[in-house]
Regions:
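N-terminal small-residue-enriched
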Residues: 1-472
């Protein structure tokens, strides 16, 4: 995290008096609150396919977004340069939202807290493309060496660094430098006339030091894990049954099926199934659900959100009780509470809205093997792909790529290509056991609620007593 204010002022070619002029202009028609979001981002990627390496590209993005809030209305405009004349035009455009609007909301300063969740990540820009070639070629070689059935390997390495500066009408001035490194490897396996593929990704808010032998060995080993089961797997008969969710990537179901319903914009508008449940028990006592912006080097973490609010660890559910929604400044002002650091945006062209960061369920006390042993008939699932969720009703459907049948307390036949169908509140209420093996999945998770932002997820092993499994 860079703390040298002059670096940011020089990067965006502005002065503090100019920032004050812009916010004054933005409030010239009587808005309640105004803020400026400056951003300079560099992106780089390399792709290895069929043994050939190509530069996926290097590009930059630069600009400022200006927001005005009046009551529950938002005015937003942006400029792709920081010439004062163009920024003043954007501020004037955003200020028009206040015309003819009498309603007001009160915004207060947030705690002046200095976070540092990615302390050594700013060195991507100093590296030449050639510095990464040994890593991706050695990773390709190691993956091929793991299994003779591999016929193709594709590897993508990418990095970005975003320098942001935020200023608002409360006088808060915040800066942050946000690194992101990602590696994705895909292997295609051929066995007779059958083909399977497996992709593994890792992503962190780290600098180039993340590209090391340990990461290479981890990815290569994970790509070939359980591939025999993939070739043997079949679709089971569907129906109502117990489902054991494996630790780690199963957290995506928590994110999609339940996490979005905890975002405050849906709740203040009465659109979430949890809108009237604050302070009530919504699941068993052993369940606590967290959205965390403070995990060191995590893809979803942030020293500050995109409104300049310090990152924090927010308990949405504690001991089975709904205790908090996920707030940006607007929803926090509406509820009369402090924001939780969840105001996020894709880039300066977008208005911030409540978004998750790293969402996970905390550890319980149950033994994962004991959970499986307790199930007479059900499925164990550990790898998901896409899903659909209805925020208002809480209904969800998820596609499961791999897992196992559970028969008489034992994992038996491998399964694939099934759907898990349920309802978020009902699934929470039907949690029968929470394991003691919490795992955060460090894949390249990206949430697409109106905009794309990096997130993370995780879970311990969890037993849900009753879900619909869509199979044969």
């Amino acid at each position: 995290m860079m703390t040298n204010l002059q670096y940011y002022l020089d990067t965006f070619r502005v002065s503090v008096p100019q920032l004050e002029t812009l916010t004054s202009t933005a409030l010239s028609h009587g808005g309640d609150f105004a803020d400026l979001y400056f951003e300079y981002t560099t992106f780089f990627s390399l792709l290895l396919r069929d043994g050939e390496v190509s530069a996926g590209g290097f590009h930059t993005d630069f600009g400022v977004g200006i927001r005005v809030l009046k009551g529950e209305k938002t005015g937003y405009a942006y400029s792709e340069n920081t010439e004062m004349s163009d920024m003043l035009k954007a501020a004037e455009a955003a200020s028009a939202i206040a015309l003819g609007t009498d309603s007001r909301m009160t915004y207060t300063s947030v705690t002046d807290k200095k976070n540092c969740f990615y302390p050594d990540g700013g060195n991507w820009r100093q590296m030449e493309a050639s510095a990464f070639l040994p890593f991706i070629r050695n990773l390709e070689k190691e993956i091929f060496s793991k299994d003779s059935r591999i016929v193709k390997v594709i590897i993508r390495l990418s990095d970005s660094v975003s320098d942001v500066m935020m200023f608002n009408s409360l006088g808060e001035l915040t800066t942050d430098s946000r690194p992101m490194g990602s590696v994705t490897a895909t292997a295609v396996f051929q066995q007779g006339d059958m083909t399977e593929n497996r992709s593994v990704s890792r992503s962190f808010r780290k600098g180039v030091q993340m590209i090391d032998d340990a990461l290479m060995h981890e990815i290569a080993s994970e790509v070939v894990r359980d591939i025999d089961a993939r070739f043997e797997a079949s679709r089971p008969k569907g129906g109502q049954m117990s489902v054991v969710m494996g630790a780690g990537a199963s957290g995506i179901l928590l994110h999609e099926a339940m996490g979005h319903a905890f975002e405050a914009d849906f709740n203040r508008k009465g659109q979430s199934v949890f809108s009237d449940k604050m302070g009530q028990r919504i699941c068993p006592e052993e369940v606590s659900v967290v959205d965390d912006g403070t995990l060191l080097y995590n893809r979803g973490s942030g020293n500050y959100d995109d409104e300049g609010v310090p990152g924090e660890k927010t308990y949405m559910v504690r001991d089975g009780i709904l205790t908090s929604y996920l707030h940006d400044r607007i929803s926090a002002a509406w509820y009369g509470i402090s924001p939780t650091g969840n105001g996020r945006r894709e880039n300066f062209r977008y208005n911030p809205i409540p978004r998750m960061r790293a969402t996970y369920m905390e550890n319980g006390n149950a033994d994962p093997e004991g959970m499986i042993a307790s199930v007479r008939h059900g499925v164990y699932v550990d790898e998901f792909s896409n899903g659909q969720v209805k925020i208002g009703e809480g209904d969800f459907t998820f596609f499961v790529k791999s897992g196992y049948l559970i028969e008489n307390g034992r994992l038996t036949s491998p399964i694939k290509d099934i759907n898990i169908i349920g309802n978020g509140p009902e699934a929470l209420a039907d949690i029968a056991a929470v394991g003691n093996d919490l795992k955060i999945d460090n894949g390249t998770w990206t949430c697409g609620k109106e905009q794309s932002v990096p997130v993370s997820c995780g879970m311990p092993t969890v037993l849900i007593s009753n879900l619909t499994v869509g199979g044969e």
